Amino acid sequence: MKKSNVNIFFDAWVMFKRCFIISLRNPETLLTATLIPFFLMVLFGTVFGSISDVGDFNYIDFIVPGIILQSIGQASQYSAMNVTSDMTKGIIDRFRCMSISKSAVLIGHTGAGVIRGLISNAVIIITALILGFRPQAGFIDWLLAVLFLLLINITVTLIAVLCGMISKSVEGASGLLFPLFILPFMSSGFAP
């Protein structure tokens, strides 16, 4: 019997709540997803910002996009690890026995990962504003930036969920996504 779209939406909502509650019960998940980018912003914005010469603008304005992308990669690692954990512990097999949509589990993991990424992005932007980040953006520009961040968060989290599905261990899932965490450091996002 085919499930209706309402049932799929409800199943996805239940799986999202389950995944997000798991994140809340493991405070280190949210803490590391927010504290590491926070400390990187403070470190690069204050210590390295005072020794680098980027011309006529503030170094903090230069590094905010790189740290945001780095934090999205880091926050998505938890989605991959949670999917792999569910698969290795047999939780996905239990869900297969229930009458829930097969895609609801993946939508739930993706939604929780996107929320973690957006929380991390908000912490970075607030920290950057405190440290002197002064973007020349209007309301429409901010709205477009938030939509773009949402799209990047969704895309990277979907990649993380896929990596979590193909990984055989939680550690392997984290390792598969390490390039997403380190890629901004290898780009020109930190060095002018």
Task: Specify the residue positions occupied by each region the protein language model found.
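Metallo-beta-lactamase
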Residues: S188-P192
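Transmembrane helix-boundary elements of multi-pass transport/secretion proteins
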Residues: S4-D11, C19-K89, G117, N121, ...
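Helix-loop-helix units of permease transmembrane domains in multi-pass membrane transporters
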Residues: V83-A112
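A helix-boundary/kink motif common to multi-pass secondary transporters
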Residues: R25, R96, S101, K168-S169
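Alpha-helical transmembrane segments and their short interhelical loops
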Residues: K102, L106-F178, I182-S187
